[in-house]
């Protein structure tokens, strides 16, 4: 762990508070990790020990952080033996957590119309960011989510109007609806009320509906698979709006020591290699996906 991050990343023996399973081997895990909960910001993640038999931790994005209750929520999909073992945890079990790690999203006040785009396991940071933005009256978040497997929540028709949303696209995330945050869903799987296509195409459709003068108020934030992030960056370029993307990358140490997660990033001084774990995971889309 580098000296810069030593005082902001905590190791905690977190107690499992709840563990809910959804379709397609997706889980929402709530952990008692008060230090992490107090310091987490949207876009940061935790490095978990899935089981004592495995030496390597797994990075998981934080979906919610409740400082008052000292808890964090993470959403994950079982891929590989490590997360399969994590899925066996029940309330009362303990999980070693290292976090929060990483630089998160930084909304800019001059662009209060925030477009949040999440795909698959890239959904959690968007929920976290939406929760923080709704606490401030000046921000106007719109959350768009895409998935090709059943969503990790029970979608329902929205009662919040989203001007510019394609006709019939009414499915939403209930939690966001309860917060008063508008959301819409996209999928190629033909789920009721969802936009039939990629979530980035839904984002483009909504941006197209805006008066060109309104684009100066919009900033995009995205998290998901690399192919989705490239598409989000292209949409942002097309409409001339800034976009921050949260990258997904394989990690070993996750605290900047091994540089195993380094990616090429364009900087004013030229190309550079940046560590996704501590230099990111959030970067300007133009730096990661230049024209």
Annotate each PLM feature:
Residues 2-91:
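Ferredoxin-reductase
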Residues 84-245:
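FNR/FR-type flavoprotein reductase catalytic core
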Residues 125, 226-228, 248-282:
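Local cysteine-cluster metal-coordination motifs and their immediate loop/turn environment
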